Amino acid sequence: MTRRNHLVALAVAIALGSSGAGAAHAAAAQPSAAPSDQLAEIVVTATKRKTLAQDTPISMTVLTAANIANRGLTDFNTLAQGVPGLAMRTSGPNQTEYEMRGLNSSGGNTSMVGVYLDDVALSAPAAEQLGKVIIDPNLYDLQRVEVLHGPQGTLYGASSMGGTVRLIPAMPQLGVFGVSGETIVSNTGSGGSINFAQNGMVNLPFGSTAALRLVGSASSTSGWLNRYVLAPGSVQSDTCATTPCYRPSNFYSAPIISTASGVNSSTDRSFRAILLYKPNDQLSITPMIMWQESSGNAPNAVDVNGSPTNPTMPSPKGHYEIYQTSEPQWDRFTLGSLKVDYAVTPDIGLTSITGLWSNHSLISQDGTEENASSSGLGSAGTAYPYAVNYSNPAYPYPSPSNDGFGGNGIGPTGPGPCGPGVEERDYTRQVSEELRLASTGHGRLHWLVGYYYQDLFSDWDMWSINQQAGPIGNIYVDYMPQTILQNAFFGNLSWEFPHGLKASVGVRWYHYSYSQRNTEWGDFTVYGFNNLLSGAPTVAGNIAPFNTSAGGSASGTNPRFNLTWQIDSEHMVYLTIAKGFRLGGTDQPFVGYNHPETAASCANPSSLVDLQQCGLMYKLSATPTQAGKYNPTGLVNFPNVNSQGVPQFNSDHVWDYEIGTKNEFFQHRALFNLTAYFERWMDPQISTNIAGFGFTVNGGDANIYGLEAAFRAHLGYGFDFATDWGYTHSKFLTNSAIDGIPEGYSVPDTPKVTGSMSLNYHHSLTDNMGVFGNATYSYVGSRYDLPYGVTVYLNNIAQTQLNLPSYGILDLRAGLRTARWTAAIFVDNALNKQTLLDPLPQINIAIPQYTRYIVNQPVTYGLDVSYQFGGE
């Protein structure tokens, strides 16, 4: 973009901001005015009743609308980088799973961190990846964000084993008309270009009893990564015989014949409407609808050089392909909810929250590399020449209109269809109801009882389709619909004793049932593999679909105990013991399990495919015999496999023991909170891998302990300082023959140190004008990941362990503020730190040497202009 175009874009931003039709980073409210001499008190609803954050005996991180706006935060992923003990595994926009206090969600169907929009649960225990993917809502017009550390299973249920995130939207205001808007224009360096965002809010009063709050957002983010198409024969295979043959060690030296720039661009749109009807002091009715759609042209992922223990980005960085394959991503989320609050008596309140939401998503990935070399099919002269030589005249390219992926790709001989790709299509629908009856008075006794119902349906579909007219049609197709029904009753009772002592006890009883069907077919099912490797490839469509089903149910209780000593109005100490859990479920089937044609290979397994189809795993301590055979004494049966070859895994749970203190000093000018915790994670759901197919098993127990600290201070002279830090130490206690993780290893994806520091400044120039600034540094420590689980047959976890470096991000912001206007310049990632965040999960057959990594956005600088009239 030329300098003139940059100036035009900035001028448009200012004009749109002045019209009030723009966007705000946080709530419609402007960032807070000049800080007072004392820290502001924050009201939270973490215990499902209103309390002050400093009076609530829970380790938590709370960001208000002013905090979010002062830092210029626009999405939860950026916010999460500074929350102690909170880790992320991300595949890009709206493809993120959150983990807290060392509890990893790499296995299983359910997130470890419950995410709520107000009181509606968004983290569904759905099948495969979708259950862990949380939408990344725009932080515009949020009243606050509450991050509750540690198990919250008593009040928040199965998906809150590690903690809970509550996104509280700003509510309509009765009798007040208000408009706010903000426009943001920025530029991303290191290959990116112009980004644009607009959000706006309107608060419409209808008399003195009703009001409607409308919120809209739209943004476009430029891509900064490229896609490189390599010369024919550039197949990543350690066995290929073509000349030249570029193997993983020198793959990036292969000739580049085509380049697509900025392929990871994305757009986001969202809308939210909340109606408040309050006819009297006893009753309030609050319906809400929300819609959000996100689309991207490719993940924020690059290929890497080097070994898993020392990965580096090649130059130029990007994704290298055998030929051009587009990788679009798309996600649409729709929610409707109804909240009713009714004061039964002056001291008893009844609350009902009904939620209905659905999510559609599409993820597509390049599958050429994996399909080319999976299970040894990467050699020239094998039964499938397509695996190495895409220009083989025996298997010509179809027309672009038949390629199934939009065409317009670049083949080895010029323009042609896209290459073999993989698509994951997910649909999830959830209906939920929560009914609570609670005391609302100010006496010594406080109580709450409630009921929760969940009806969830999810459909996970995967397509891996060959784009050639040869013998292979569908490489792999899988349909996996699942239903979950859950009922729970919960309650909490607390009593305030003399001398500041307070004791509370809570419990949640739950029962859930699930059923899952699976239909798969294609040559890359394991039964299909058996035919291929025997030298008898079948014509496309001749491998009949393989159908299986499984189900189960379980019940249990989640207790919680708390003892608090309020020493005085500024100092508190508390002790908490709590239990958390997540649901069990089913895996994909072993396709050749108990099949007559696989009996011989199961008796004397000689390949990884044999292990997979027979439901066998290789012990961590065993070693293969010579000639590639697998020593039968070193094999163990996969646990919990039903008669149809479908493995199932049980619920895992955690016991948490923590002691904490919350303190204020210097007449509320400073605070210091500290929590120490110990957790015992029992029967953890761990991902393991056989022949490229991922499975979840219940592994050996793990111990986790750590510290969480928060400090806030009003320093005077216009300065405020805030810092949050967390330390987590974890280790597995046994050498598990099932999950393959050795004793003493830490839990994957768990940085030992996380934290942030933030310095705010405000100085008044006149009575209604001032300047402000903010500098925030966020740090995430080193960790390792197991994106393919532990391929235990390798007998060495280091061969699949991918190390991720520590990183720190510095964000800067400064501007001018009046009563209605705010204008700010900002630099995000000011040090231009580009790092490897996470390995990109492969939805195709998982092969470690083709690992791609998610990377963060390079330095981005821009202008932010906002306006507010009336309301809050």
Task: For each feature predicted by the language model, list its residue ranges.
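Solvent-exposed loop segments that connect transmembrane elements
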Residues: 224-262, 297-324, 366-423, 463-479, ...
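N-terminal Sec signal peptide and the immediately downstream disordered periplasmic leader
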Residues: 1-73, 77-81, 203, 281, ...
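C-terminal beta-signal and adjacent terminal beta-strands/loops
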Residues: 778-790, 815-872
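Transmembrane beta-barrel wall of Gram-negative outer-membrane proteins
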Residues: 190-297, 332-337, 428-432, 438-454, ...
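Gram-negative outer-membrane beta-barrel transporters
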Residues: 499, 503, 669-682, 697-788, ...
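Extracytoplasmic beta-strand/coil segments of soluble accessory domains associated
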Residues: 45, 77, 81-124, 143, ...
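Membrane-embedded beta-barrel scaffold of Gram-negative outer-membrane proteins
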Residues: 199, 339-345, 349-355, 361-367, ...
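Short acidic/polar hinge/loop motifs at secondary-structure boundaries
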Residues: 120-149, 198-200
